[in-house]
Regions:
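Conserved Rossmann-fold NAD(P)-dependent oxidoreductase catalytic core, especially the SDR/UDP-sugar
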Residues: 87-128
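N-terminal Rossmann NAD(P)H-binding glycine-rich loop of SDR-like oxidoreductase domains
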Residues: 3-23
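NAD(P)H-binding glycine-rich loop region in Rossmannoid oxidoreductase-like domains
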Residues: 35, 43-84, 88, 92, ...
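Amphipathic terminal alpha-helices
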Residues: 275-300
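Substrate-positioning beta->alpha
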Residues: 159-164, 177-199, 203-207
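Flexible, glycine-rich beta-alpha linker
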Residues: 146-164
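Mid/C-terminal beta-alpha module of Rossmann-like enzyme folds, strongest
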Residues: 194-259, 296-299
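Active-site Tyr-X1-5-Lys
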Residues: 124-146
Length: 300
């Protein structure tokens, strides 16, 4: 089978491309830069439709990610890729099966997320990323795609989640907002496995994460130790964290830079978010990797 992977030069797309090649599939990497394996076809998601000639399956990993300064510029930049780029891809797919990698950031943060099913409301997003991913996946679902919703993807090559966390250490201390909570995380290998299994699933949305949630403070402490950091974890009262985030976002609006702290970042760490994996498990998918596996496999 010939599998097109968009965003193959990126973190998630690169893992999907390598996994597809390892499974014996011919890989076509779509993006501005070549991926780690297979044929490269240039594609700028914000400008034109992709060349899908000869392709049997499309796995759409390309996305504008991050937590930019609030405002029209960030909204437009993310919409150009996550929404308009999705529309271009779906038109080019012309009925081919599509696996669309979304995010648990589409879920409404104002509702309880102690156990989140795929039917959880998708509204009240805290940044442009959540809003545009929700709008993009709505197009994909309407087109009959399989949509995967991972949360907090980590693993080899991660440039977002753990690097951002480690960069927040100051004076030997890492401040975390609010109390200790349970959080779902997603090993990139588990996501890649789901991407390659998903073509056999019924169209619709599926949560994807590691097999069990993690206690936040213990997981963060393990990450710090594995990276040689002796930083201590201290808890910042949630109202204080939210107030600081609001002030940082206001400053970022003026400078056009990413806020030092955002309400989205606070929300991701301060409230329990556990994904219900029942729907994906019912399809025969089982997550095989854990945070401990990743941390123990890192070079000393």
């Amino acid at each position: 089978m010939r599998v097109a992977v968009t965003g193959a030069s990126g973190f998630c797309g690169g893992h999907v491309a390598r996994a597809a090649a390892a499974a014996g599939h011919a890989v076509v990497g779509l993006g501005r830069r070549p991926g780690p394996v297979g044929e490269h076809r240039f594609w700028d998601a914000a400008a034109a439709g992709p060349d899908l000639s000869g392709v049997d399956l499309v796995v759409h990993c390309a996305a504008a990610v991050g937590d930019p300064a609030p405002g029209r510029r960030a909204e437009a930049a993310m919409r150009a890729v996550n929404v308009d780029g999705t529309a271009r891809l779906l038109r080019a797919a012309a009925g081919r099966p599509v696996v669309w990698v979304s995010s648990a950031s589409v879920y409404d943060p104002r509702r309880g997320r102690g156990l989140v099913t795929e039917d959880h409301p998708r509204a009240n997003h805290l940044n442009a990323y959540g809003r545009t991913k929700a709008a993009g996946e709505a197009l994909a679902l309407a087109a009959g795609a399989v949509v995967l919703r991972p949360r907090a993807v980590y693993g080899p090559g991660d440039t977002q989640l753990l690097p951002r966390l480690l960069s927040r250490v100051r004076g030997g201390t890492l401040l975390l907002p609010g109390p200790d909570v349970e959080l779902s995380l997603t090993a990139v290998e588990n996501l890649a496995d789901a991407c390659l299994a998903a073509p056999g699933w019924a169209p619709g949305a599926y949560n994807v994460a590691d097999g069990a949630p993690y206690a936040r403070d213990a997981a963060v402490a393990a990450v710090l130790r594995a990276h040689g950091s002796g930083a201590r974890i201290r808890r910042l009262p949630l109202p204080v964290a939210v107030a600081v985030a609001r002030a940082a976002e206001s400053a970022a609006r003026l400078t056009g830079t990413e806020p030092a702290l955002s309400r989205y970042a606070v929300d991701q760490l301060a409230h329990p978010v556990v994904l219900d994996l029942s729907r994906a498990r019912a399809q025969g998918w089982t997550p095989r990797r854990t945070l401990e596996d990743y941390l123990s496999s890192r070079p000393a």
